[in-house]
């Protein structure tokens, strides 16, 4: 009898644990060095500030800009030299800087007139905007003061008008001036009795008060008796 054929499966190679660990480790797990913080502003800002402060008529050269950066920001200019040149070229192309001499980054550079005017105009607009609310706040105070002054000024005027009216009424009521006129007029006209009668008629009209009538009536008969005795 023949033996049955037995199938033999090939053995699968099992990965060793040491190799699996090596494959899992990524290369990016290495600790990265922390970047040192910047001790100076960006190159573009430093260069523009250098050109502003130097204010050279013919423009500031690359060497003058470097000296300013060293003195002002204490920067290693040798390391920043390529960045400075790159910014100068791009600033000239964009119109942020004017190149008065040379070509590329080897010439002299100056700020354009338009940039200067914009900066000069912007400053007064801010100052004017701050001053406007102050004026608006001061106006209502002035108006309030004027109103108070007007009301105070009107009151004394009314009081003065009332004071003036009172003495006028007193002068009309006093008939003291009529009494001495009657005494003087009685003895003078001795010869003519007619004018005496006319004066007696005018006297009661002038005297409005009842007090003036009594003394005038008593004096009239005395003056009339004296001329009658002389004629007889």
Swiss-Prot record:
H15 domain sequence ranges: 39-113
Ranges annotated as biased composition (Basic residues) = 132-141, 147-173, 181-197, 205-214, 222-232
Sorted alphabetically, the Gene Ontology BP terms of this entry are:
chromosome condensation; negative regulation of DNA recombination; nucleosome assembly
Q: Which domain of life is it from?
A: Eukaryota
Matching InterPro entries: H1/H5 (IPR005819), Histone_H1/H5_H15 (IPR005818), WH-like_DNA-bd_sf (IPR036388), WH_DNA-bd_sf (IPR036390)
Instruction: Keyword check for DNA-binding, yes or no.
Output: yes
| Keyword Nucleus set for record | yes
What are the boundaries of the region Disordered? 1-44, 99-232
Keyword annotations from UniProtKB, A to Z? Chromosome, DNA-binding, Nucleus
Question: Which GO molecular function, any one, fits this protein according to its record?
Answer: double-stranded DNA binding
- Where does the record place it? Nucleus; Chromosome
Q: Name one GO cellular component term.
A: nucleus
Classify the main location.
Answer: nucleus
Signal peptide span: none
Q: Where is the composition biased (Low complexity)?
A: 1-18
Family assignment from sequence similarity: Belongs to the histone H1/H5 family.
Task performed by this protein: Histones H1 are necessary for the condensation of nucleosome chains into higher-order structures.
Identification of the protein by name: Histone H1B
Q: Which organism is it from?
A: Chironomus tentans
């Amino acid at each position: 009898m023949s033996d049955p054929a037995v199938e033999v499966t090939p053995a699968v190679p099992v990965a060793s644990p040491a190799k699996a660990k090596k494959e899992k480790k990524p290369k990016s797990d290495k600790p990265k060095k922390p970047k040192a913080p910047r001790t100076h502003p960006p190159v573009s800002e430093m260069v523009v500030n250098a050109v502003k402060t130097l204010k050279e008529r013919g423009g500031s050269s690359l060497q003058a800009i470097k000296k300013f950066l060293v003195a002002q920001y204490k920067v290693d200019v040798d390391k920043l030299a390529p960045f400075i040149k790159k910014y100068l070229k791009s600033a000239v192309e964009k119109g942020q800087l004017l190149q008065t001499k040379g070509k590329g980054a080897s010439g002299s550079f100056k700020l354009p007139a338009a940039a200067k005017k914009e900066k000069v105009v912007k400053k007064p607009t801010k100052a004017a905007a701050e001053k406007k609310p102050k004026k608006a706040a001061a106006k209502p105070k002035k108006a309030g003061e004027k109103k108070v002054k007007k009301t105070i000024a009107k009151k004394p005027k009314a009081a003065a008008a009332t004071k003036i009216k009172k003495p006028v009424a007193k002068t009309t009521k006093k008939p003291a001036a009529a009494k001495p006129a009657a005494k003087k007029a009685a003895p003078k006209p001795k010869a003519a009795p007619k004018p005496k009668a006319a004066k007696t008629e005018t006297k009661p009209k002038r005297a409005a008060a009842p007090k003036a009538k009594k003394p005038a009536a008593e004096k009239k008969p005395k003056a009339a008796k004296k001329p009658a005795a002389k004629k007889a």
